From Swiss-Prot:
The gene is ycfP. PANTHER family: ESTERASE YQIA-RELATED, UPF0227 PROTEIN YCFP. It comes from the Bacteria. Belongs to the UPF0227 family. Disulfide bonds: none annotated. This is UPF0227 protein YcfP. NCBIfam families: PRK04940.1 (NF003431). SUPFAM superfamilies: alpha/beta-Hydrolases. InterPro entries: AB_hydrolase_fold (IPR029058), UPF0227 (IPR022987), UPF0227/Esterase_YqiA (IPR008886). The lineage of its organism: Bacteria, Pseudomonadati, Pseudomonadota, Gammaproteobacteria, Enterobacterales. It holds the Pfam family UPF0227.
Length: 180
């Protein structure tokens, strides 16, 4: 089972495309939708939905995957639910760059302080990070600098922020999932 979390643009047709691409790894891909506008509510909702899916799950190596803001959530929810994560261009600093787009961007900073201390150290090697060199929305190098101590970083030379085509990375993701 692969759980997919969309980014800020929840209505993007690219979400359906990524789900279809992920089905080459596992036919059981589940999209969880969330508001993107209310961080504390989103965290509660995502934890509840992922936990529900894991309770009914028969796959002993589930994976959670997210793009952009979905990558922010996939890393945290995956850690809290003890499943491996794959994140594409994760928005690591939504409290800085979501100003004017969501109601309370400061809630992201609050969530970060309430998360487990040094959670990335405890999550070491359980998250695969795929970054685009042509991300027009976020500073990929800043993300790499933040994450490379804990996770493997894979650089993509073609895609932009929304990462329309993930197919060149499917074999790597599949191998990462099987490590479980």
């Amino acid at each position: 089972m692969i759980i997919y979390l969309h980014g800020f643009d929840s209505n993007s047709p690219g979400n359906h495309e990524k789900v279809l691409q992920l089905q080459f790894i596992d036919p059981d891909v589940r999209l969880i939708s969330y508001s993107t506008r209310h961080p504390k509510h989103d965290m509660q909702h995502l934890l509840k939905e992922v936990d529900k899916m894991l309770q009914l799950n028969v796959d002993d190596r589930p994976l959670i995957c997210g793009v952009g803001l979905g990558g922010y959530w996939a890393e945290r929810i995956g850690f809290l639910c003890d499943i491996r994560q794959v994140v594409f261009n994760p928005n690591l600093f939504p409290y800085e760059n979501m100003e004017g787009k969501i109601d309370r961007p400061e809630e992201y900073a609050d969530i970060a302080t309430k998360c487990v201390t040094n959670f990335r150290e405890k999550n070491r090697d359980r998250c695969l990070v795929i970054l685009s060199r042509h991300d027009e929305a976020l500073n990929s190098q800043r993300s790499a600098d933040e994450l490379h101590h804990f996770y493997e970083i894979v650089w993509d030379e073609e895609q932009t922020h929304k990462f329309k085509n993930i197919s060149p990375h499917l074999q790597r993701i599949k191998a990462f999932k099987t490590l479980g």
